[in-house]
């Protein structure tokens, strides 16, 4: 018996092709897509304007299956976090962040992450596998209709989720073939209808795929920078050894030729005594001098294996002031959902690690080299 086709895996073109295989005309695909993504239908017999013959075909050949919630936590500040079962011993986390004028969903793209950034708790679990398109868009599908139920909104009311950030577990550009169709559905007016400015992909700097994305589907781009020079970034973001800062900055400039926004957002995790000195801020000014940008400074959320500490608020403000004095728009991210471990860098989920990262002791005993100052010689810093 053939496996059922999960219709959440199909963007508009793929769904049209699938309906063609069933002997149906393209308008049936549009109807079907609307039932799934506008109304949250998971049963074909509820799709009243589809021909009965099509509903019967779909019932035996297809399904609408999003990842199932294992846990569902609501923070005191309204942040809501789901732990979602994606099978094979893996679970990923998805977070909804309410704000006064928008609702943002933070979406995962992989079970675990192979990039292994020094300050991120996702990386400490290693990497299992890429998520499918259905598992990615299924997070938005599940969260939108769960939030509608929570807030008492009907199918004709405005959507709850107005923004999506691909900033959850995983490196999206290392799962390109599943992430792009999922984002096409986010942008599709017959699905979620988000603008390219309201879908943000965050990358640690996979340069070739940044170039590819700029041609295929240029959404808003955020780059996980976190360091002002290669020596430091090699330690904090190991991918930098493959795509150093000069290549990354050049890729950012190329991306802006196609981007829906006229700036790149640089994310910068503030680590006490590591990357938070005024000298680092000054070096950043030189690094991004010809890249229109804004900075999002992120107070570090500690976890035991990191051996790192959060910069104090005064130091973060001093750092931000250097950037702002140079005319760079700079924000300090407000910590949300930390009472349910939903803040930035805290998403961990459950990962059946194929890389055996934890087993091989890749955390806890690391003593990375970090510069004393931006222009100084590296010294050894042992975990706290």
UniProtKB/Swiss-Prot annotation:
First-level EC class: transferase
One GO BP annotation of this record: tRNA methylation
Cell compartment(s), UniProt: Cytoplasm
Active site: 93 (proton acceptor), 344 (s-methylcysteine intermediate)
Cofactor note: Binds 1 [4Fe-4S] cluster. The cluster is coordinated with 3 cysteines and an exchangeable S-adenosyl-L-methionine.
Binding site for [4Fe-4S] cluster: 113, 117, 120
A GO MF term: 4 iron, 4 sulfur cluster binding
Gene Ontology terms: cellular component: cytoplasm
Disulfide bonds: 106-344
The UniProt record lists the keyword Amino-acid biosynthesis: no
More details: Reaction proceeds by a ping-pong mechanism involving intermediate methylation of a conserved cysteine residue.
Family: Belongs to the radical SAM superfamily. RlmN family.
Function: Specifically methylates position 2 of adenine 2503 in 23S rRNA and position 2 of adenine 37 in tRNAs. m2A2503 modification seems to play a crucial role in the proofreading step occurring at the peptidyl transferase center and thus would serve to optimize ribosomal fidelity.
Protein name, per record: Dual-specificity RNA methyltransferase RlmN
Organism field: Cupriavidus necator (strain ATCC 17699 / DSM 428 / KCTC 22496 / NCIMB 10442 / H16 / Stanier 337) (Ralstonia eutropha)
Lineage, opening ranks: Bacteria, Pseudomonadati, Pseudomonadota, Betaproteobacteria, Burkholderiales
């Amino acid at each position: 018996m053939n496996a059922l086709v999960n219709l959440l895996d199909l963007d508009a073109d793929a769904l049209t092709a699938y309906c063609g295989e069933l002997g149906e005309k393209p308008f049936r695909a549009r109807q079907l897509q609307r039932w799934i993504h506008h109304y949250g239908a998971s049963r074909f017999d509820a799709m009243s304007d589809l021909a009965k013959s099509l509903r019967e075909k779909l019932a035996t050949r297809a399904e609408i299956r999003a990842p199932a919630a294992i846990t569902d936590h609501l923070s005191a500040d309204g942040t809501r976090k789901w732990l979602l079962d994606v099978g094979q011993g893996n679970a990923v986390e998805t977070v909804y962040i309410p704000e006064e004028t928008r609702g943002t969903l933070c979406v995962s793209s992989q079970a675990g992450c192979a990039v292994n950034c020094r300050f991120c708790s996702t990386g400490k679990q290693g990497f299992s596998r890429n998520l499918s398109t259905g598992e990615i868009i299924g997070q938005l599908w599940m969260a939108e209709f769960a939030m509608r139920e929570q807030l008492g909104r009907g199918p004709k009311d405005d959507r709850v989720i107005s923004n999506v950030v691909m900033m959850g577990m995983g490196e999206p550009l290392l799962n390109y073939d599943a992430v792009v169709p999922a984002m096409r559905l986010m942008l599709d007016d017959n699905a979620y209808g988000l603008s390219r400015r309201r879908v943000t992909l965050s990358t640690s700097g996979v340069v070739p795929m940044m170039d590819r994305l700029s041609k295929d589907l240029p959404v808003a781009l955020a780059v996980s920078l976190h360091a002002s020079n290669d020596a430091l970034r090699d330690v904090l973001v190991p991918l930098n050894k493959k795509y150093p800062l000069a290549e990354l900055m050049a890729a950012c400039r190329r991306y802006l030729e196609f981007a829906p926004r006229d700036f790149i957002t640089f994310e910068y995790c503030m680590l006490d005594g590591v990357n938070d000195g005024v000298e680092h801020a000054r070096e950043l000014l030189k690094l991004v001098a010809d890249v229109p940008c804004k900075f999002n400074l992120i107070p570090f959320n500690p976890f035991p294996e990191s051996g790192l500490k959060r910069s104090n608020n005064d130091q973060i403000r001093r750092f931000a002031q250097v950037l702002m004095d140079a005319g760079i728009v700079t924000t300090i991210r407000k910590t949300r959902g930390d009472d349910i471990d939903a803040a930035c860098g805290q998403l961990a989920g459950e990962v059946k690690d194929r890389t055996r990262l934890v087993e091989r002791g890749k955390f806890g005993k690391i003593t990375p080299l970090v510069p004393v100052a931006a222009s100084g010689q590296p010294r050894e810093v042992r975990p706290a």
